[in-house]
């Protein structure tokens, strides 16, 4: 029985890895072994950062809401507590968008939160 080296399968597998490494710099793009390692590491970073992105955006929204609330003479935590007591159910993403785009509407929400805290 003749020896089978698996040339086409091996080449296809390596070509796939090199294709995934497109855009990397130097040896990480051209050499199979380092490209494979970098593609694996990139996958780990992507997995981690898909979860991290959610945390980062929540932090950003809270920072924006806090800044806008302090412009209206109230802290973030008091604002959120006041909104909860006033039965205003609005998520942080929408609240931060309102704070950026419509200061008047955000001011009204702050006033309702202040009234609910009294």
Curated annotation (Swiss-Prot):
A single GO BP: translation
Lineage top rank: taxon: Bacteria
CDD domains found in the cross-reference section: Ribosomal_L20 (cd07026)
Keywords: Ribonucleoprotein, Ribosomal protein, RNA-binding, rRNA-binding
Any one GO cellular component localisation term in the record: ribonucleoprotein complex
A Pfam family matched in the record: Ribosomal_L20
Keyword Ribonucleoprotein listed: yes
Molecular function (Gene Ontology), one example: structural constituent of ribosome
Role: Binds directly to 23S ribosomal RNA and is necessary for the in vitro assembly process of the 50S ribosomal subunit. It is not involved in the protein synthesizing functions of that subunit.
Similarity section: Belongs to the bacterial ribosomal protein bL20 family.
Protein name: Large ribosomal subunit protein bL20
Source species taxonomy: Bacteria, Bacillati, Bacillota, Bacilli, Bacillales
Gene expressing this chain: rplT
